[in-house]
From Swiss-Prot:
Name of the protein in its database record: Sugar fermentation stimulation protein homolog
Origin: domain of life: Bacteria
Classification of source organism: Bacteria, Pseudomonadati, Pseudomonadota, Gammaproteobacteria, Chromatiales
Gene Ontology MF term list: DNA binding
Gene3D superfamilies according to UniProt: 2.40.50.580, 3.40.1350.60
Coiled coil regions in record: none
Species of origin: Nitrosococcus oceani (strain ATCC 19707 / BCRC 17464 / JCM 30415 / NCIMB 11848 / C-107)
CDD domains xref list: SfsA-like_bacterial (cd22359)
């Protein structure tokens, strides 16, 4: 995925009320940017970090700027969680996810339980096989290069695991939790048990019930983000 415009560099002054970020652009202008990330952004919200923002051309938007990338020194990090589904769909369609080859159709935001929609539904009409893919954007790096999720307690994330596990009811029906690590400096993926032990327990239970776990790293630059390679899973 290439950004459709040139990103503007700046310095993060503060992130507050979850969805707002004060940024000093390199031009000297101070702006308020939308922060499209509901997590804690642990390690990525400290004042003084370098950032990149995009500017919308829509005059009706209350905030013209959106926080896109944070410079974590060892890697640029994509913090726009809304881009995770786009990146994953693009990678699947391009055949870069070896474990998800062979599906002719990809649909987004398909209802699959009473109160949930799946991020991506892969289908092969010729064999009637399908694969439910829930995508999580991972930005937290800990310890010796572990990509960790979640970065804050998430009851919603635990519910998604329960919903996924409930779909594994036929050999023709797969369920995949896909962790998209939007940074380049991680060696493996592991659940963040120190932050949300309940989520880690739910993840291990879902695996026992047939849910598959995939984690992929990204190459991140101010020009765009590309899904690159599979990461080992440490449970």
């Amino acid at each position: 995925m290439s950004f459709d415009q040139i990103l503007l560099p700046g310095i993060l002054r503060r992130r507050y009320q979850r969805f707002f970020a004060d940024v000093a652009l390199e031009t000297g202008e101070s702006i308020v940017a939308h922060c499209p990330n509901t997590g804690s952004m642990r390690g990525l919200a400290e004042p003084g970090l370098g950032v990149y923002v995009s500017r919308a051309n829509n005059p009706r938007r209350k905030l013209a700027y959106t926080l896109e990338l944070v410079d974590a020194h060892t890697s640029l990090v994509g913090v726009h969680t809304g881009r995770a589904n786009i990146l994953t769909k693009e990678a699947i369609a391009a055949g870069r996810i070896s474990q998800l080859l062979g599906y002719g159709e990809i649909r987004q935001e398909v209802r699959y339980s009473k109160n949930s929609r799946i991020d991506l539904l892969l289908e092969d009409p010729s064999t009637q096989q399908c694969c439910y893919v829930e995508v999580k954007s991972v930005t937290l790096r800990q310890g010796d290069g572990a990509a960790c999720f979640p970065d804050a307690v998430t009851t919603r994330g635990a519910k998604h695991l329960d919903d996924l596990a409930a779909t594994v009811c036929s050999p023709r029906q797969r369920a995949v939790m896909f962790y998209l690590v939007q940074r380049e400096d991680c060696r493996y993926f592991t659940p963040a048990d120190d932050i949300d032990p309940r989520y880690g327990a739910k993840l291990r239970s879902a695996i026992e019930q047939g849910v598959e776990i995939l984690a992929y790293a990204c190459q991140v630059s101010s020009q765009g983000i590309q899904v690159t390679q599979s990461l080992p899973i440490h449970l």
